[in-house]
Amino acid sequence: MGELVDNLPEEVLALIFRDLPLRDLAVATRVCRAWAAAAANSTVWSDKSISCDCELEDLLPPYLSSCLDHIHNLRLEYEPSKKPSRGTATELLTALASRAPRLRGLRLECRGEKPLFDAGQDILGAVHAVCGAAHQLRHLDLRHLPYTLDDTLVLKAAAGCPELRSLFLDNHALVNSVQPTSVLKLLEACPHLRALGLHLASMSRAALELLAAPHRSPFALLALRCACPEDARASPLPDEAWATLSCRHPGLEVELELEPVLPDEAVTRILQPAVPVAVLRLNLSGDTVGPVRFATRHYAETLRALEVRASASPELHTALEELAARCAGLREIHCFCVVRPSVLDAFRAHCPRLRSYTLKLKREPHPWRPTLVR
């Protein structure tokens, strides 16, 4: 067996090594010259996931640092509360910025809680540097960063990354500092953008109209998160603008996430009939039955996934049964309260495309796991 491994072609070894964690990859390079050569193969590095769980020198020895040139798509994970982890993440991003022409995709993810009053200036500064240098960047996903994102970042991406296809800024920060004017500049600078994630307050009627312009590339996904005080006060996006956008891009899907900060009147402003809602997440402190019934009336043709976090009630159960009867294309339903058996029966009977559901008939220990439909 040892001889077989020793005689494997470099291309085969590279396919084996590409899924190794970075630290294990560094160990493999010390086995023999053939393994070291395979570990430096571009196949290993083209699409890379890196978890920053130690100092950079232990994670990425100097003799492997040149391999960063091969990275096209990177998923970088770190723990903001651990100094070595965030230091390594910052150094890696800074190193990428200095050799970024090949970078096509960047996704950042935080594990654990961030320290109190941590604004993430080190990480965000490195992201700014990447945006200023990675002129061929296609995909930037910052949904899992816990920091407040602002106009500076959006304008840096607009100026430095004209080839962007997707940009997700709809993170879980408590404050939204991205103004609608910055989003307009981004859309003007990035004509090929196909997917965009924002807080609702960052969106405007002018942005919807620009996305509907004849010269735009097909637009596929708009994810809007409504979770900040700014979102609750945001100007309404008129139904006629949504209708025009849907007509211009028939395949457009909208994801709406409504959080407890929204009063009932704000929810009424946000839920417009012409919005092509494919994913709806309701985690409201007020009325939930009304939005579920609104979705039944207006989103039956487009709704693919519904998530409800609310207290159980006969009215909610009835609304869910009515939705099941109308939304035949539904693929996921997740309700985080105990439901009566007829709710489960309704979704099983009327939704033939259902792939997973969370519909519990009695209380269970958390976290509740979805049931997969085979």
UniProtKB/Swiss-Prot annotation:
Q: Does the keyword Signal apply?
A: no
Q: Where is the F-box domain?
A: 2-48
Supply the alphabetized keyword list. Ubl conjugation pathway
Entry annotated with the keyword Translocase: no
**UniProt cross-references to InterPro entries, sorted A to Z:** F-box-like_dom_sf, F-box_dom, LRR_dom_sf
| Gene3D superfamilies per UniProt | 1.20.1280.50, Ribonuclease Inhibitor
The record ties this protein, via Pfam families, to: F-box-like (PF12937)
This molecule's function is given as:
Substrate-recognition component of the SCF (SKP1-CUL1-F-box protein)-type E3 ubiquitin ligase complex.
> What is the protein name given in its UniProt record?
F-box/LRR-repeat protein 8
Record organism: Mus musculus (Mouse)
State the organism's lineage: Eukaryota, Metazoa, Chordata, Craniata, Vertebrata
The gene is: Fbxl8
